[in-house]
Design a protein with these regions (language model features):
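Structured secondary-structure scaffolds
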Residues: 13-115, 168, 177-184, 239-271, ...
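Acidic, turn-prone loop/beta-hairpin segments
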Residues: 110, 202, 206, 212-220, ...
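A broadly conserved sequence feature marking short terminus-proximal activation segments
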Residues: 175, 396, 401-402, 545-555, ...
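Short metal-coordination and nucleic-acid-contact micro-motifs, chiefly zinc-binding Cys/His arrays
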Residues: 201, 432, 537, 965-968, ...
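Phosphate/diphosphate-binding loops
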Residues: 407-433
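Cys/His-rich microdomains that often coordinate metals
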Residues: 443, 548, 976-979, 993
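Intrinsic disorder/low-complexity segments
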Residues: 467-468, 473-489, 872-898
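Cys/His-coordinated zinc-binding microdomains
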Residues: 973-976, 987-990
Length: 996
């Protein structure tokens, strides 16, 4: 009721119909959200008003918070992982913006690499074209167009999700300027002698015919063939015990036997000689039982050695200086060379036989040990995974990753069996094996000439840093094992480890995860043998094998790439870059391209340092490091690490101050999503069915730091939670209908105790939400907000004060009673605080809420964090850094522990009363709690229990609840002693309706 004239009230008294004398909440804000239809309209309004530019202008000159976007791959529609990742980033940016900071967001995309090449090659194959017959410039143009298509597609999908940012100016790694920056960063490594060309075993994909970075590899459980192979020792060390002695090796990669060059033993390992049929077989003593179990039943053509006796034990060091014959030594040539026994500190007795066959072509330990002993790779396996056609054994017969090639009845095992060297072969060994994360095919270690960044070479161009004394709290201290060396110029590994120790990780376990990876990683393989990527822009002297390191040449190359992109790197322009000082005929132009992880690892240089995005330039001229990198936990071995190594190698520090990681999204049953399982969930479909705000609420409600789930039932629960939050705002809008400044009470001390209590709870919520933002704990943020709305407001405060809201207004109280004025004043504070708190989570709904009350005002996303003193005086403008008065008021409200404890006990009693009333309601003894009369022990004298419990009367005495005999007020429906008959008025209603 907004009309305070007395005529309707007089008629109500005469007719007994008081409906028009009570206040009924009124709002145009509907309970049914209709998000899929409404959100695009709100988004269009934001775009039309250029909201992003308004936000940037409003925060110009403020303290900065810079989140640097890890670029998603420009290939395919947005998936649920993209959605979660970008919602979290948006939450970071919006909460920092809400706190008054200048928090720009520049989205980016990773545009080079093999997956795009594959898709373009597919298009060529459909046209009956061979990619190798197409000019490389044309092929790259197709790749560029393909990437741009998916950039445009994903951009619209992310905008629909409500992600704010500079969408008109994203960064793309295929921009010419970005490609030039990547080249410049590469040439910094070259200038500082931090590149080398070498032949080392690297992860290689025979299907994709290229080297892979560790981050491009995923591990899958497979079943492999395991074999035991006997190598005859050239000079029998135990002639008094056996006629011949054999060293037995075990492997799950039979295809590597053709390039065996040595056998490794453990010097301190105890070995056993098993005698059977006059022959002796050497295995680790601890593995005799396991080995003999594999040897039963015996392979055809071999002796039954599964039951042989151990006739001698000896230390591995006794094998030093001895040699063995390759099982296929009869082929002559390479196979006829003696295979030396070499001591290897990596040899264990965990599995196998305790002896390891060595091939420098196909293993890191193998390569290092063989190289130290003068054994070089033979490069027998080619890029497609086949042995060279001219290789004496198995040349050109099949890919080494082919199951049949390695099978017990395949060519390798068959030939070993014919040679009498195969002791056991079975296709039953289950283990985890590396696969290409793109093609899903198995990868191998293959020794090829590649370009590397050394991890353990001293970087004389980097200033040494003293060890940091302060550690991040509650993270278990430092993990840097190299701190004692940091008084000198560091290696890349040392610099990276120190940078890790200087970085904040959320969750904290991320520190040890990336630290252990960096501590144990090999040199960084930069080169790839593909076409779509940034070239390794080096000229190598054909005589010396050294790459040219000339700043003028480097500058010309960078300038050309900035103007024409990667196509600028061509033979036709080689002399142009070399200038008059060098002859192009004397130099090899490298045609390999860079690892795409180097591309993305350089984005900090392009995005944060170039000045192309002025909002990202530090106002204080300080470090270019981002405040935060935020990606999935798999990026500890991907973007987090490549960015770290690139930045430490060129700048001596990490490109980030903090790293936040999230887990993976599983289906409702906890299974990994995959197209083959048919359990993928499209965020595009979810936005169509539920709306983006539901998807956002889900993402910010789960514990995203761990793997989490999504499914229909889960989303139904989220939708229910959304409805409760929406209903809270609907109630606030309706209850504040007609609220005026004249009605407002700003003196908290003059308010009823319940209002003071609610403001204390709000202040407590505010402090906890601020802490959640500082902790990046958005699960807690959303839970706190929802619990406050559901438990403290809807189920408690709103419920209690409905009577005051509806009935404490009339001709005698045109502004309402003091209690009603205080209630509506607090509701106004709640509205302006909660709409701000909810804005980063429910970006569309909060805009709808704000626009419903203030249709001519600007966007809710221009508001700042609530300042309580300002909120109480002028809630609509009550944002920004807290004033001194606000800080004092916040402190007073938050520090009222006695009041909060008192009301916690009252709420506990209220819950007990509600529990005791419920049986009477179920039995239909009463229809509502207003008809109940309650007896309480230890009733406090200063509390209006009838109001708190929403009951008729409350007496002191033993616990009891009964139906009251009091009559019901015809206006407020309360059953009170002063009501003389049903339909008559209580004292309060008489008073507010009496204008005299």
């Amino acid at each position: 009721m907004t009309d305070s004239t007395s005529a309707p009230d007089q008629r109500a008294k005469e007719t007994g119909d008081y409906r028009d004398t009570v206040f009924l909440p009124k709002t145009d804000f509907p309970m049914k959200a209709g998000l899929p239809q409404k959100e695009p309209l709100i988004l269009a309004k934001w775009l039309e008003s250029d909201l992003e530019a308004q936000i940037r202008e409003a925060r110009r000159g403020r303290d900065q918070f810079i989140l640097h976007d890890g670029p998603p791959y420009a290939n395919g529609d947005m998936h649920i992982g993209h959605a979660l990742n970008h919602i979290l980033k948006d939450m970071v940016v919006r909460t920092q913006t809400l706190k008054g900071k200048d928090a720009p967001y520049v989205p980016g995309w990773d545009c080079h690499g093999l997956p795009i090449e594959w898709k373009v090659e597919e298009q060529y194959r459909k046209k009956k074209l061979n990619k190798d017959e197409v000019p490389v410039e044309e092929f790259r143009a197709e790749c560029r167009a393909y990437a741009q298509h998916w950039v445009d597609t994903q951009r619209e999908q992310l905008k629909r999700l409500g992600i704010g940012g500079d969408w008109d100016h994203p960064y793309l790694t295929m921009d010419y300027e970005a490609e030039a920056t990547i080249v410049r960063e590469l040439l910094k490594f070259a200038a500082n002698d931090m590149l080398y060309r070498g032949a080392k075993p690297v992860m290689w994909s025979p299907v994709e015919k290229t080297a892979l970075a560790e981050a491009e590899v995923e591990y899958e459980d497979i079943v492999s063939t395991q074999i035991d192979v006997a190598f005859e020792i050239v000079e029998n060390p135990f002639p008094e015990l056996v006629e011949k002695a054999f060293a037995v090796i075990w492997t799950t990669t039979p295809w590597t036997i053709p390039v065996n060059q040595a056998l490794a033993y453990g010097s301190d390992v105890e070995y056993a000689l098993i005698r059977e049929g006059g022959y002796g077989y050497i295995v680790a003593a601890d593995l005799v039982e396991d080995t003999q179990r594999r040897w039963m039943p015996p392979e055809p053509g071999t002796v039954a050695i599964g039951g042989g006796d151990v006739v001698h034990r000896f230390k591995g060091s006794e094998l030093a200086g001895r040699t063995a014959r390759h099982p296929m030594h009869a082929l002559g040539g390479f196979f006829a060379r003696p295979r030396p026994f070499l001591a290897g500190d990596f040899v264990t007795t965990d599995s196998g036989t305790g002896l390891v066959h060595m091939s420098p072509d196909h293993g890191e330990d193998d390569f290092d040990l063989c190289k130290a002993n003068g054994l070089d790779p033979v490069f027998a396996v080619e890029g497609d995974g086949k042995y060279r056609e001219d290789w004496a054994w198995l040349g050109g017969q099949g890919s080494v990753i082919n199951l049949k090639f390695n099978a017990p009845d395949g060519p390798i095992c068959s030939d070993l069996r014919d040679a009498g060297a195969l002791l056991a072969a079975s296709a039953d060994y289950k283990h985890s094996y590396p696969h290409s994360w793109r093609s899903k095919a198995k990868v191998i270690y293959r020794c090829t000439p590649q370009w590397f960044v050394p991890m353990d070479k001293v970087m004389t161009h980097i200033e040494p840093k003293p060890p940091r004394e302060k550690r991040w709290e509650n993270e278990g201290g430092a993990i840097n094992p190299h701190e004692e060396d940091l008084c000198a110029a560091p290696t890349l590994r040392q610099a990276a480890m120190q940078a890790i120790d200087d970085t904040r990780f959320v969750p904290a376990k991320g520190r040890n995860r990336i630290g252990s990876m960096v501590e144990g990683r090999p040199d960084w393989v930069l080169s790839r043998q593909r076409a779509w990527g940034v070239p390794i822009t080096l000229f190598v002297d054909r005589k010396t094998g050294q790459y040219l390191n000339d700043p003028l040449v480097s500058d010309r190359i960078v300038a050309a790439v900035k103007e024409a992109g990667v196509d600028a790197w061509s033979d036709a322009r080689a002399q142009e870059y070399l200038g008059d000082s060098y002859n192009a005929a004397d130099y090899e132009r490298i045609t390999d391209i860079l690892d795409v992880w180097f591309d993305s690892g350089c984005t900090h240089a392009f995005v944060l340092e170039s000045g192309r995005w002025p909002a990202l330039v530090r106002h204080d001229g300080g470090t270019h490091s981002a405040d935060l990198y935020l990606e999935g936990s798999d990026q500890h071995r991907g973007w987090f690490q490549s960015s770290l190594l690139e930045s430490c190698g060129t700048r001596g520090q990490a490109p980030y101050k903090a790293v936040l990681t999230h887990g993976f999204t599983m289906d409702a049953k906890g299974f990994k999503m995959s197209k083959s399982l048919g359990n993928t969930i499209s965020p595009i479909d979810l936005m169509r069915d539920y709306g983006a705000d539901i998807l956002r609420l889900w993402a910010l409600s789960v514990d995203f730091t761990e793997d989490h789930r999504i499914g229909k039932e889960i989303l139904a629960g989220v939708a229910d939670q959304y409805r409760k939050l929406r209903n809270t705002f609907r109630y606030l809008l309706g209850a504040l209908d007609g609220f005026t400044e004249e009605e407002r009470i700003t003196d908290v001390a003059a308010m009823p105790e319940l209002e003071r209590y609610m403001l204390s709870l709000l202040a407590d919520l505010d402090a906890k939400l601020r802490q959640a933002v500082d902790d990046f704990d958005y699960n807690a943020y959303t839970r706190l907000l929802a619990d406050f709305c559901n438990e403290d407001l809807s189920a408690f405060y709103f419920d209690i004060r409905k009577d005051v809201l509806y009935c404490d207004l009339g001709p005698a109280a045109p502004l309402g009673t003091e209690t009603r004025r205080a209630y509506r004043s607090v509701l106004d504070v709640l509205f302006h605080a909660l709409v701000r708190y909810a804005a980063p989570v429910l970006v569309f709904t909060s805009e709808e809420v704000w626009g419903t009350r203030y249709p001519e005002a600007g966007s809710v996303h221009l508001l700042e964090w609530p300042d309580f003193a300002a909120l109480l005086r002028h809630p609509r403008e009550g944002g920004g850094p807290a004033s001194n008065d606000g800080e004092k008021l916040d402190s007073r409200l938050r520090g009222n522990d006695e009041l909060i404890e008192k009301w916690a006990q009252i709420r506990g009693t209220r819950a007990l009363v509600t529990e005791r009333i419920e049986p009477l309601r179920r039995e239909k003894t009463i229809r509502s709690s207003l008809e109940a009369e309650v007896w309480l022990p230890n009733e406090a004298g200063d509390v209006d229990y009838e109001e708190i419990f929403i009951t008729s009367t409350v007496h002191q005495g033993d616990w009891d609840v009964k139906r009251t005999e009091n009559h019901k007020c015809g206006r407020c429906w309360r059953h009170l002693p002063e009501v003389t008959a049903d339909g008559a008025l209580c004292n309060r209603c008489e008073t507010v309706l009496d204008a005299q």
